[in-house]
From Swiss-Prot:
This is ATP synthase protein 8. Keywords: ATP synthesis, CF(0), Hydrogen ion transport, Ion transport, Membrane, Mitochondrion, Transmembrane, Transmembrane helix, Transport. Mitochondrial membrane ATP synthase (F(1)F(0) ATP synthase or Complex V) produces ATP from ADP in the presence of a proton gradient across the membrane which is generated by electron transport complexes of the respiratory chain. F-type ATPases consist of two structural domains, F(1) - containing the extramembraneous catalytic core and F(0) - containing the membrane proton channel, linked together by a central stalk and a peripheral stalk. During catalysis, ATP synthesis in the catalytic domain of F(1) is coupled via a rotary mechanism of the central stalk subunits to proton translocation. Belongs to the ATPase protein 8 family. One of its GO terms (cellular component) is proton-transporting ATP synthase complex. GO terms for biological process: proton motive force-driven ATP synthesis. F-type ATPases have 2 components, CF(1) - the catalytic core - and CF(0) - the membrane proton channel.
């Protein structure tokens, strides 16, 4: 019975688990946490009045 021979599918199983446990989380985390927040300054900018050219 060829399905009981672990040689052909065991390597695929091991390498796929290595991919899911080691490589994939690094790639997912780079997409989830790529927007690092920056500290805002304490001084608020003054709002500029709108300049409507047709008035």
């Amino acid at each position: 019975m060829p399905q009981l021979n672990p040689h052909p599918w065991f390597a695929i199983l091991v390498f796929s688990w290595i991919f899911f446990l080691v490589i994939l989380p690094k790639k997912v985390m780079t997409h989830l946490f790529n927007n690092n927040p920056t500290a805002k300054s304490a001084e608020k900018p003054k709002p500029e009045p709108w300049n409507w050219p047709w008035t």
